[in-house]
């Protein structure tokens, strides 16, 4: 709209200049004409020329006005076309953006889809055909990959006990064998004598053998840790063998 206003102002200035030129020309023609009564032909000729000049000026001014009006209409049409073009561009941009987003989503869906031929009933052995003539076999059961399983609360706090190493089991077996030998020797001595009285050494030894499990249970209850399941470093028999002696 500012351009249109500037164009209108320029056209108005041109019209004013033409009007000034017309007035100046009329004054110049009046000054040049000589007021003599003996030359009626010259006055008539000057009047005819003025009329012709005024008529031509009016025609030119009308043409200028018509041209200005045409220019104004053309400018309005250009502005309307510019607005329409900008709206069309915006709509096209929106459509292209929506189409691109839809295509991108479709590509993602295609990539995420699994092969329809896969099923859970397939065999565990798959054939991998390489450039070599002989096919290579791969089994999931004998694969190298092993996933570590963390300990569960049921494994840690349950009735199951931790398996000892062979080095920890052997000394315990030896102590059990020694205890059984001593008990058998005491039984043989008592049967041979046939009396209920026992020697002080054997009674002390039996007392020590009877008191020993209670000490071991106290040590285990005080020093052992429940969460870790690690046994004490002392070679003590398990509490399951307190009541049973072989």
Curated annotation (Swiss-Prot):
Domain of life (superkingdom): Eukaryota
Record's protein name: Uncharacterized protein T25D10.4
Bias (Low complexity) ranges: 35-49, 190-203, 214-225
Organism: Caenorhabditis elegans
Bias-annotated ranges (Polar residues): 172-183, 235-246
Signal peptide: none
Sorted UniProt keywords: Glycoprotein
Disordered: region residues: 29-54, 93-114, 148-246
Residues carrying sugar: 219
């Amino acid at each position: 709209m500012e351009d249109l206003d500037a164009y209108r102002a320029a056209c108005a200035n041109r019209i004013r200049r033409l009007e000034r030129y017309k007035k100046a020309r009329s004054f110049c023609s009046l000054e040049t004409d000589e007021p003599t009564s003996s030359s009626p032909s010259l006055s008539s000729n000057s009047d005819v020329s003025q009329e012709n000049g005024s008529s031509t000026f009016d025609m030119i001014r009308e043409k200028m006005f018509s041209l200005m009006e045409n220019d104004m209409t053309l400018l309005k049409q250009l502005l309307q076309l510019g607005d329409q073009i900008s709206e069309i561009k915006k709509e096209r941009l929106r459509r292209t953006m929506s189409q691109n987003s839809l295509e991108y989503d479709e590509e993602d869906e295609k990539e995420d889809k699994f092969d329809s031929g896969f099923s859970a009933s397939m065999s565990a052995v798959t054939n991998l055909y390489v450039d070599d003539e002989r096919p290579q076999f791969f089994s999931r059961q004998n694969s190298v990959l092993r996933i570590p399983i963390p300990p569960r609360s049921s494994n840690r706090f349950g009735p199951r006990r931790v398996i000892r190493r062979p080095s920890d089991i052997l000394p315990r077996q030896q102590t059990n064998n020694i205890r059984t030998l001593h008990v058998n020797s005491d039984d043989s001595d008592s049967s041979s004598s046939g009396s209920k009285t026992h020697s002080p050494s054997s009674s002390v030894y039996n007392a020590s053998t009877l008191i020993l499990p209670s000490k071991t249970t106290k040590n285990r209850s005080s020093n052992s840790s429940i969460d870790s399941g690690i046994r004490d470093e002392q070679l003590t028999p398990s509490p399951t063998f307190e009541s049973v002696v072989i």
